[in-house]
């Protein structure tokens, strides 16, 4: 089987965990259960078939360096799980647009190199799948790269909360071009949103009325520092909120995107946490006899490795769709792997739909 030729835009902690993760599991036995992956062999593709052939960034400490070096450079501070040999993939100067917010601009030095022609670079590298890891709030930049993917006939995996796959206009653009997209906003393996979503549904399934809830997140990576700029947070808060409330069938919070009784979002930046994230979640409800029933928990994770396996699955799903000539949103992959897919499903149903897609039993 041929490799999946992958390009990355945004060589931050998530890209670091992705590149390290492919190296870490490249020799995994196909019958092994790997934490964070649906399958070692996802359809025709093994983890080792993911091959990085291009990368784009705007950080002067990354542009011009081999991807294997850039993933450990500048402000990247995630846990190291694997050495990565030289890849022969220099990080190219990407397009900035709105990709650098206030805190990014104060922290890193923007490369003075000329931005490359992204479409031509994707074509030259014969890229199959482009993964967008741009900072939260990069609305213009993310849509720019999405258009580049369409123009270069490259499948697009949208890991950030900019609504592209879930926007009917953009979905039609991808479908008309025959280019697959998996988006929007990557889920973690076991993160704050997925645990919150499951427990909110558990309340409902057990007949408890969920009246109010919050999810407060703190971390020490550049993602959290960037999100101190509250103007960049609107889509992030919406994505996390609707991921939780869309899993409720009825009750006062069902389907709510904005409500005083639901608060879900990043809260603060704590530098010494590095790439760790701490989530504080509380659910308040009413049980039999209108008696209060409250649940509170704290989740501690390394943020970036927590989604790396999910991205590997998303990349392989996008490539399968490309192989089959399917354009537009890949609904089964999106509903299981993303927080804000075009169509929300309960998680067990989403996984079953994706398994059926892998087997070729449903189109998308």
Where are the regions a protein language model picked out?
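Rossmann-fold dehydrogenase core element
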Residues: 173-186, 207, 211
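Structural motif
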Residues: 9, 133, 159-160, 184
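Short gly/pro/ser/thr-enriched loop/turn and capping motifs at secondary-structure boundaries
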Residues: 16, 163-167, 187-192, 219-221
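NAD(P)-dependent Rossmann-like dehydrogenase/reductase catalytic/cofactor-binding core
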Residues: 306-364
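Rossmann-fold NAD(P)-binding glycine/threonine-rich loop
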Residues: 135-151, 159-180
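N-terminal glycine-/serine-/threonine-rich beta1-alpha1-beta2 phosphate-ribose binding loop
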Residues: 1-145, 233-238, 279, 288
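Active-site-lining helix/loop region of Rossmann-like oxidoreductase modules
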Residues: 9, 48-51, 62, 69, ...
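Receiver (REC) domain switch-region micro-motif
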Residues: 130, 156, 293
